[in-house]
Amino acid sequence: ALGLRAFTLFRQKRMALFFIFSMCLGICLQITNGFASPFIFSFGGIPEYADTFGVQHANILISISQISETFCILLIPFFLGRFGIKRVMLIAMLAWVFRFGFFALGNPGSGVWLFVLSMLVYGVAFDFFNVSGSLFVDKETDISIRSSAQGLFMMMTNGLGATIGTLSAQAVINRFVYALPETASGQEVIAGWNTCWYIFAAYALVVAALFAIFFKYKHVVKDECGR
């Protein structure tokens, strides 16, 4: 009644690996949800960037991520049919590498285009794993526990993964982000964010590599295209 039968899926190696990697991607999701805004706003203490559009309208800049997310859903049927579920999920993992990497390299001034690319690639990073992952669960589980399995998938990504992501990302940020001496105008300058984003990008790259090596799945065109 409580959906606990879904936990028996951990007895299957492929499903266990899938749920573990789902948790790992949930960590990435929480990193970007929790710290993208503070990162962009931190440029406000630097005179060169204080009056830029990115700093003054950071929420509008970040909203490009949601727009991208909406349009990337339309790409999923094509990519699933062309590349299969495993490769689509791997593309999502690599997209997280670019999401974090563009943050590390960009700035709200001359490098704002890198921020825009980071927002655009978010749609691939989010949709390609969450939607294809849900389809994978639906296909691989018995109808009697399918709903519970979907709940377990959400728990691993938005529950356990999000919790670990919040705690671990905060630990990294507390370690590497620091305040520089105040400027002549009395503004506080925050530094060290780039290091954090490189660490997060490296983490996503390691997860993608491990997924490519250990997660086994054979693409069958007629099953995944619905033909």
Residues covered by each model-derived region:
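Multi-pass alpha-helical transporter architecture, strongest
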Residues: 193-227
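Helix-to-loop junctions at the C-terminal end of transmembrane segments
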Residues: 71-85, 173
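A membrane-interface helix-boundary motif in multi-pass transporters
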Residues: 171-204
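Loop-to-transmembrane helix entry/capping segments in MFS-fold secondary transporters
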Residues: 55-56, 141-154
